[in-house]
């Protein structure tokens, strides 16, 4: 495969939204990532895709501090509706700072800091994720052209820089509530996320 990731195994994964094929990938350092796929990608047509970074609090514990869980659910539903697509699930918790540091950052947010201020106060990067990992997964699956479910322009640019043709950006505005309103505004104001179209 690529030097970034190796494909390890695949299996059938029935979910609330339909059946996916789950592919497991591993980095040389042992970090694991998965991709959920539906359909065949051999025709070369653009593939509906979501690059989703792990969020234990939002994806599994249903936290209302973020929009991650609703975004993952909406992406899974969209891929099943399309009948063809991929969700790349990168194990980069807390924008790459890890779960314990995310809990520390959440504590500072509880004291009034926003998500960016909290990371910086802890001496951590604002965003330490590496979206190039997705390109390795696309390469393994033969995907060269995508329709990307995202509000994050950095994901688009990273894929383009890696030679992936992003033919369309599909906004993913779901999950806003009173608890995460400031967080979403900070993503727009300080991280450049496209939140208003």
From Swiss-Prot:
Q: Looking at the record's lineage, which domain of life comes first?
A: Bacteria
Which keywords belong to this entry? GTP-binding, Hydrolase, Metal-binding, Nucleotide-binding, Riboflavin biosynthesis, Zinc
Q: Where, by residue number, does Zn(2+) bind? A: 55, 66, 68
The note describing how and how many cofactors are bound reads:
Binds 1 zinc ion per subunit.
EC numbers listed for it are 3.5.4.25
Entry's Gene Ontology BP terms = riboflavin biosynthetic process
Q: Which GO terms describe its cellular component?
A: cytosol
**Molecular function per GO:** GTP binding; GTP cyclohydrolase II activity; zinc ion binding
Looking at the Swiss-Prot or TrEMBL record, what is one Pfam family this protein matches? GTP_cyclohydro2
Instruction: Give me the reactions it catalyses.
Output: GTP + 4 H2O = 2,5-diamino-6-hydroxy-4-(5-phosphoribosylamino)-pyrimidine + formate + 2 phosphate + 3 H(+)
Q: Where does GTP bind?
A: 50-54, 71, 93-95, 115, 150, 155
- The first-level EC class reads hydrolase
Q: In which pathway does it act?
A: Cofactor biosynthesis; riboflavin biosynthesis; 5-amino-6-(D-ribitylamino)uracil from GTP: step 1/4
According to its UniProt record, which cofactors does this protein need?
Zn(2+)
The record places the active site at 127 (proton acceptor), 129 (nucleophile)
InterPro entries, per database record: GTP_cyclohydro_II, RibA, RibA-like_sf
What is the documented function of this protein?
Answer: Catalyzes the conversion of GTP to 2,5-diamino-6-ribosylamino-4(3H)-pyrimidinone 5'-phosphate (DARP), formate and pyrophosphate.
Name the PANTHER family on file. Answer: 3,4-DIHYDROXY-2-BUTANONE 4-PHOSPHATE SYNTHASE, GTP CYCLOHYDROLASE II-RELATED
Q: Which family does it belong to?
A: Belongs to the GTP cyclohydrolase II family.
Name of the protein? GTP cyclohydrolase-2
Q: Which organism is it from?
A: Neisseria meningitidis serogroup B (strain ATCC BAA-335 / MC58)
